[in-house]
């Protein structure tokens, strides 16, 4: 993990087209702005993990349902 120190108003670049800017620093909280291409998905980690879990649940197959389809 790379750890970088930034002050309010300062930015860092990821590759050529993703810019992260520190916009506000409060007690125990940092507000950041992210400028990235529209094709890049940006999610908070807790939301990303929730989406991944829902995707895993969505691909589970009910074997009894498949057996019933096969019998027809």
UniProtKB/Swiss-Prot annotation:
Molecular-function GO terms, alphabetical: mRNA 5'-UTR binding
Q: Which GO terms describe its biological process?
A: bacterial-type flagellum organization; mRNA catabolic process; negative regulation of translational initiation; regulation of bacterial-type flagellum assembly; regulation of carbohydrate metabolic process
User: May I have one GO cellular component term?
Assistant: cytosol
Annotated transmembrane regions: none
Which InterPro entries does the UniProt entry name for this protein? CsrA, CsrA_sf
Q: Which UniProt keywords apply?
A: Bacterial flagellum biogenesis, Cytoplasm, Repressor, RNA-binding, Translation regulation
Which chain positions lie within coiled-coil regions?
none
Q: Spell out the subcellular localization from the entry.
A: Cytoplasm
Could you tell me what this protein does?
A: A translational regulator that binds mRNA to regulate translation initiation and/or mRNA stability. Usually binds in the 5'-UTR at or near the Shine-Dalgarno sequence preventing ribosome-binding, thus repressing translation. Its main target seems to be the major flagellin gene, while its function is anatagonized by FliW.
The record's comment on protein family reads: Belongs to the CsrA/RsmA family.
What does the record note on quaternary structure?
Answer: Homodimer; the beta-strands of each monomer intercalate to form a hydrophobic core, while the alpha-helices form wings that extend away from the core.
UniProt-recorded name of the protein: Translational regulator CsrA
